[in-house]
Amino acid sequence: MHHHHHHGGSGHPESNTPEKEVPSVIARHVSQYACQRKTTLNNYNKKFTDALEIMAENYKFKENLQACLEAKRAASILKSLPFEVTSMKDIQGLPCITDDVRDVIEEIIEEGESSRVKEILNDERYKAFKQFTSVFGVGVKTSEKWYRMGLRTVEEAKASKSLKLSKMQKAGFLYYEDLASGVSKEEADAVTLIVKETVALVVPDALVTIAGGFRRGKPMGHDVDLLITNPGRPEDDELLHKVVDLLKKQGLLLYEDIRESTFVEGQLPSPKIDALDNFQKCFAILKLYRPKVDNSAVGTSKKSDMAEVKDWKAVRVDLVITPFEQFAYALLGWTGSGQFRRDLRRYAEEERDMLLDNHRLYDLKKGIFLSAGSEEEIFGHLGLDYLEPWERNA
């Protein structure tokens, strides 16, 4: 079954262009799996999906993971629709729409906004958790602790003398403004170039590939995911350490946390949909020097103003070392989106009897690992039509 939107040419009389096609006809054919839907950044239903994502986040803060997943799934489905939802008829027959979600959509159609979401945005706990989790190294568990201590804002947490902070959280506070401001495509490209040049000094023929939202065509992100793979050579555990040392020597490394590989040859992919991967990797914060701007002001400024003129920005970077034979799987996993990756794994298991993770694909029926040299081959193994990275913004 191909649950793609009929964009003409499939021989059915009803498959006109999406404009002419009745929304309810489209809705009935939408797959429950993001890996069978094209989802570009062109979202006709932003007012609905924004609301559902706030709901999902609130559920996450309350650690109600099932409800969180349901709201996220519904948002993802609405993102894929080639038309704007204007009546409840439009969503008839869509998969994965819970009553919870339906109520929110209905109210937005009727009132233009959701009272439920307004409530969340005004909720003291939600607002505090939203602030806390925007700090690098702070998750729901830590937020919970800080909230119980009576803290409500990043400012208050920063000023608190009684917090035991991890190395990660200290860096998160130290570079908070920079990290919270997000990363532009230009900044991501500049970071990629720095890493490419540094890697080339260690291994000239290694490949550095940007993944994540930027590979999916997003103009902004909150970090830069870079995969480093070395086609010509067996794995070298030292490559990452050498690259990190060189970045340090150049004075470009503000923070690093290296995790060694935990990959076990021959082990089956984890059946957990959200399992982390086992690659050797470094979570880092890089010092990105800003392009020199008009310097006339700087020359005349007194020493006290110099603090204002910080000529660099802290940027979050993940460096991931991927063995060449696992590269296609790593690229597919790290390109995302998160929802796309989750649904791809779910599809593999539920529809194909296969286990997929960021390292490999295992066919449970045949009892073999399926190798792949490209993302296209992985889609092929799964019997899926290929989706370009920019069509995976689920």
Label for each model-derived stretch:
Residues 1-121, 141, 162-394:
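Structure-specific DNA junction-binding interface
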Residues 60, 132, 146:
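Generic anion/oxyanion-binding catalytic loop in active/binding sites
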Residues 134-136:
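Catalytic cores of DNA base-excision repair glycosylases
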Residues 141-143, 149:
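Fungal eukaryote-biased detector of long internal structured cores
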